[in-house]
C-alpha cells in the first residue's frame, strides 16, 4: 500500500475557503496578517458570506511576493478568541488571482489589506471577458475608478493603450462646467453704448423665437476696469475663453448661448479659429494639443474683449495691410465697439454688491 500523499501547495496566490467560520472579517484578517511565512505577504482580501441556513463562511485570497510552499494543511487554521474552536480551510493555489478576486467581490461584504498584485491569466481566457471589463469600467462612475478596473482586468490594454483609454474615459466621464454666477446683474450696467445694447437685445431678446441662423459677433475694445468682462459674462450661459483657446470638456460646453473671448491676442486667434468663432460657424473640429480632435457644435456668436494698443487691439491688428482680407470678412460678421467710459456707474454696482452681501449673510 503506497504511503499517503503528503500535503503540498506551492503558489504565489492562495484561495482559502472556511466552510463554517463565525469569526468576523476583521479578526480573520488580523490572524492571517500575523502568520509567519518565509515569503512576504502582499495582499489579503476576505469575503464573508452566509449559507442558506444562515451559517457564515469565509472566502480568502492571499497573495505572496513570490511562490510560497505550504506543507502543513493546518497552517492557515484560524482560532476563535472567545472559545475553544479552530476553523480549518480548504486550501488551493489560485491560477488567476484576478478571477478569485472577482469571485470574492461578488457579494460586497469584504475587507482587504495591502496592494493587489495584477496577473494576466484572466485576460488570457479566464472568466473575465474584455466586454465585461469595459462594461464594468463604464459603470465605475469616474475616470480613476474605471482605470483601476482596466488595470486589474485588462492589463495589456492598460499598458499598450493607456493614453487612448485615458483620453476616451475623460471624455465619457466629463462633467459640464459649473455655470458661472455673475456678481452683478445686467441691469447694473447703465452706461452701455446704444449699438452695443442693440446687439444684445437683438440676440438675447428674441424670447421663445429661434435665434438667428448665423448671428453676428461683437468686438468690444476698452481700457481695463471698464466692466466689459463682467457685462459680457452676465448676459447668459456662456463659455469663457481667456488668454488661450481651450475646448476641453471640463471647461467648454456645446450647450451655451455664446462664447466670451477675453484678452486673447488677435494674431493667436487668427492662427486658430478666428472665422469659426466670430463667424458662428456650425459643426467644426478643433485639434487640441496632446488630444484627439474635439467636435464643436457652434452656431453661436462671440463677444471678443480686448484692450487698446499694439498686440491687443483687434482694430489695429485688422488695419494692417497683410490682414486686409480678414478685415473685410470680419466687418461682415462682427460689429466693433470702442468704449470711452465704464459701462456702469459706481454707485449702482456698489449698492447691488451690498445687497448681495446682505442676502448671503
Swiss-Prot record:
Cofactor note: Divalent metal cations, possibly Mg(2+) or Mn(2+).
InterPro entries: CRESS_DNA_REP (IPR049912), Gemini_AL1_CLV (IPR001301), Gemini_AL1_REP (IPR001191), Gemini_AL1_REP_central (IPR022692)
GO cellular component terms attached to this protein's record: host cell nucleus
Region (Oligomerization): 156-176
PROSITE patterns (UniProt xref): CRESS_DNA_REP (PS52020)
UniProt-annotated binding residues for ATP: 222-229
GO molecular-function terms, A-Z: ATP binding; DNA binding; endodeoxyribonuclease activity, producing 5'-phosphomonoesters; helicase activity; metal ion binding; nucleotidyltransferase activity; structural molecule activity
Motif RCR-1, chain ranges: 15-18
Chief localization: host cell
Keywords, alphabetical: ATP-binding, Covalent protein-DNA linkage, DNA replication, DNA-binding, Endonuclease, Helicase, Host nucleus, Host-virus interaction, Hydrolase, Metal-binding, Multifunctional enzyme, Nuclease, Nucleotide-binding, Nucleotidyltransferase, Transferase
GO biological process: DNA replication
Domain of life: Viruses
Residue positions binding a divalent metal cation: 49, 57, 59, 107
Cofactor annotation: Mg(2+); Mn(2+)
Active-site residues, as the UniProt record annotates them: 103 (for dna cleavage activity)
Subunit structure: Homooligomer. Interacts with the replication enhancer. protein (REn). Interacts with host retinoblastoma-related protein 1 (RBR1), and may thereby induce the transcription of host replicative enzymes even if the cell is not dividing anymore. Interacts with host PCNA. Interacts with host SCE1 protein.
Record text about domains: There are 3 rolling circle replication (RCR) motifs. RCR-2 is probably involved in metal coordination. RCR-3 is required for phosphodiester bond cleavage for initiation of RCR.
Sequence similarity: Belongs to the geminiviridae Rep protein family.
Protein name: Replication-associated protein
Organism of derivation: Tomato mottle virus (isolate Florida) (ToMoV)
Lineage of the species this protein comes from: Viruses, Monodnaviria, Shotokuvirae, Cressdnaviricota, Repensiviricetes
Amino acid at each position: 500500500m503506497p504511503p499517503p500523499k503528503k500535503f503540498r501547495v506551492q503558489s504565489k496566490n492562495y484561495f482559502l475557503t472556511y466552510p463554517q467560520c463565525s469569526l468576523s472579517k476583521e479578526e480573520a484578517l488580523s490572524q492571517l496578517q500575523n502568520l509567519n511565512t518565509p515569503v512576504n505577504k502582499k495582499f489579503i482580501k476576505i469575503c464573508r458570506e452566509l449559507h442558506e441556513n444562515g451559517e457564515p463562511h469565509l472566502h480568502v485570497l492571499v497573495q505572496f511576493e513570490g511562490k510560497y510552499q505550504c506543507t502543513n494543511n493546518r497552517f492557515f487554521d484560524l482560532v476563535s478568541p472567545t472559545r475553544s474552536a479552530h476553523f480549518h480551510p480548504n486550501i488551493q493555489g489560485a491560477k488567476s488571482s484576478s478571477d478569485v478576486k472577482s469571485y470574492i467581490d461578488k457579494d460586497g461584504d469584504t475587507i482587504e489589506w495591502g496592494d493587489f498584485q495584477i496577473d494576466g491569466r484572466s485576460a488570457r481566457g479566464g472568466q473575465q471577458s474584455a466586454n465585461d471589463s469595459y462594461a464594468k469600467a463604464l459603470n465605475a462612475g469616474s475616470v480613476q475608478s474605471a482605470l483601476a478596473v482596466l488595470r486589474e482586468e485588462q492589463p495589456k490594454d492598460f499598458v499598450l493603450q493607456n493614453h487612448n483609454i485615458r483620453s476616451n474615459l475623460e471624455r465619457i466621464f466629463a462633467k459640464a462646467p459649473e455655470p458661472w454666477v455673475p456678481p452683478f446683474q445686467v441691469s447694473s450696467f447703465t452706461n452701455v453704448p446704444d449699438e452695443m445694447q442693440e446687439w444684445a437685445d437683438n440676440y438675447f431678446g428674441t424670447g421663445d423665437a429661434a435665434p438667428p441662423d448665423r448671428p453676428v459677433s461683437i468686438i468690444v475694445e476698452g481700457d481695463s476696469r471698464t466692466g466689459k468682462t463682467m457685462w459680457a459674462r452676465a448676459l447668459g450661459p456662456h463659455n469663457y475663453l481667456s488668454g488661450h483657446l481651450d475646448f476641453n470638456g471640463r471647461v467648454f460646453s456645446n450647450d451655451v448661448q455664446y462664447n466670451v473671448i477675453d484678452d486673447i491676442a488677435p494674431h493667436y486667434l487668427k492662427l486658430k479659429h478666428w472665422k469659426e468663432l466670430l463667424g458662428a460657424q456650425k459643426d467644426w473640429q478643433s485639434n487640441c494639443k496632446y488630444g484627439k480632435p474635439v467636435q464643436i457644435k457652434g452656431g453661436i456668436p462671440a463677444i471678443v474683449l480686448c484692450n487698446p494698443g499694439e498686440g491687443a487691439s483687434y482694430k489695429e491688428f485688422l488695419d494692417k495691410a497683410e490682414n486686409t482680407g480678414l478685415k473685410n470678412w470680419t466687418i461682415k460678421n462682427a460689429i466693433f465697439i470702442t468704449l470711452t467710459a465704464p459701462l456702469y456707474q459706481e454707485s449702482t454696482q456698489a449698492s447691488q454688491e451690498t445687497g448681495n452681501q446682505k442676502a448671503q449673510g
